[in-house]
Amino acid sequence: MPKLKPGNKVPDFTLRDPEGKDFHLYENLGSMKTMLVFYRGDWCPICNVYLNNLQQRIAEFRDANTQLIALSMDSPTDAWNMKQRLGLSFVILPGLNKEMIEAYDLVYNEKFHYNEPAIFIIWPDGTVAFFAITSSSLGRPGVEDLLSIVSSI
């Protein structure tokens, strides 16, 4: 049974963005829904395609009053390079650690030391509205499905 489920508050966190600024989750919730996109890393081609697909529909997420935040165990340099290469306009947070992975009940690949993908859509008060945790690079909710979810809640 997952630790986090709809109605539970997500753990707060502080991570440094690729530009070196501290990002505090709860200070940035505001009045919008927030979609946390946990991805494997810049090295994962499927993650790159997925993040690019999210970027292509960013205006629709904003129209659905939803901000996107992508998180990984990447280094700040790798995260910055990926953000620039893909032209991502949403927040990218590198430096995800094992404590956060455990707090969010994500699948962790012990052999290669990275988290598997997950999506958490949270309300402005920090409670979970929807989540999907995968155990491999495949099986993530499609962008169209995510837009349908954020538009209907």
Label each region the model flagged:
Residues 1-153:
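Chalcogenol-based redox active-site neighborhoods
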